[in-house]
């Protein structure tokens, strides 16, 4: 099963101390570079960053189409993490996109995700 996640669901689980739920449910979860940067570069989550860096199931990968990411950001107003997650899920035919933002879910749904 191929799973792609955006930033906020991971942050929520990290803050609760239950990031491992994703591992138990899905085994491996792909996150695009922008999501990784949002997770590890935010000063609010310094205490939780080790959960991401030390994770054996969160796999950071590059998106295949940066042009699509840029266009999606410009057209939809989504941020880099949301846009990269949607483009990655679409291009890799993911079974599930984990995203909590209403606007992002709406865009993903219109794209058939």
Question: What annotation goes with each model-predicted range?
Answer:
Residues 1-95, 102, 111-113:
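Active-site-proximal, substrate-binding regions of enzyme catalytic domains
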Residues 105:
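Active-site-adjacent loops and short helices of periplasmic peptidoglycan-processing enzymes
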């Amino acid at each position: 099963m191929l799973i792609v996640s955006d930033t906020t669901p991971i942050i929520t689980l990290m803050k609760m101390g239950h990031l491992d739920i994703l591992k138990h449910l899905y085994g491996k979860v792909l996150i695009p570079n922008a999501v990784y940067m949002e997770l590890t570069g935010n000063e609010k989550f310094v205490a939780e960053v080790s959960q991401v860096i030390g994770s054996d199931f969160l796999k950071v990968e590059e998106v295949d189409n940066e042009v699509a990411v840029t266009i999606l950001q410009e057209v939809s107003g989504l941020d880099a993490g949301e846009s990269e997650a949607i483009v990655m899920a679409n291009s890799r035919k993911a079974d599930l996109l984990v995203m909590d933002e209403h606007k992002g879910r709406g865009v993903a749904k219109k794209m058939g995700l």
